[in-house]
């Protein structure tokens, strides 16, 4: 599959998911819908495949901002299985952390924080863990604090 097809596939699964969400829940914000609602999306395996192909074939530094936001949103919506977050290469994980810093997506921050121990640079992992510890979302903060402890990050005791 060529890069153009991979990019189109990511965009298609993103827009298809939004259409489904709108049909099922109207204009409700994700955090107001309730738990595990994304599990009812029958096409989630297609989302996983599109995200996997995208991060494997398109270098993170080459992503357009909109592509990064779409991948971040889909990662957030995969919060029960955490498959997307778990398969991100390091460069993609870091790019999504930066995208989250610029424009957070509900349920994405804690998933990114949980993946920080995979980073090759302990200093970078500490930096991002501290960032997520200060997230306005309480659950993201808690998960980031647990990760900080496992990383033996200096900010953990503050």
Which ranges hold each PLM region?
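Amphipathic alpha-helical scaffolding segments comprising HEAT/armadillo-like alpha-solenoid repeats
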Residues: 62-69, 89-102, 122-134, 153-158
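N-terminal alpha-helical scaffold/docking segments in eukaryotic complex subunits
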Residues: 1-82
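Structural detector for internal amphipathic alpha-helices that build alpha-solenoid repeat scaffolds
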Residues: 34-43, 52-57, 69-89, 107-121, ...
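Aromatic-residue detector
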Residues: 8-17, 95-96, 101, 108, ...
């Amino acid at each position: 599959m060529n890069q153009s097809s991979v990019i189109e596939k990511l965009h298609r699964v993103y827009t298809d998911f939004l259409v489904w969400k709108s049909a099922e829940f109207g204009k409700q914000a994700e955090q107001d819908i309730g738990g595990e609602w994304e599990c009812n999306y029958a096409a989630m395996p297609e989302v996983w495949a599109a995200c996997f192909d995208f991060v494997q074939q398109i270098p993170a530094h080459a992503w357009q901002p909109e592509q990064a936001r779409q991948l971040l949103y889909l990662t957030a919506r995969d919060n029960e299985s955490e498959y997307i977050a778990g398969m991100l290469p390091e460069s993609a994980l870091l790019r999504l952390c930066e995208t989250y810093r610029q424009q957070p997506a509900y349920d994405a921050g804690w998933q990114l924080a949980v993946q920080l121990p995979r980073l090759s640079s302990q200093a970078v992992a500490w930096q991002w863990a501290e960032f997520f510890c200060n997230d306005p979302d309480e659950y993201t903060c808690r998960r980031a604090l647990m990760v900080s402890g496992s990383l033996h990050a200096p900010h953990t005791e503050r």
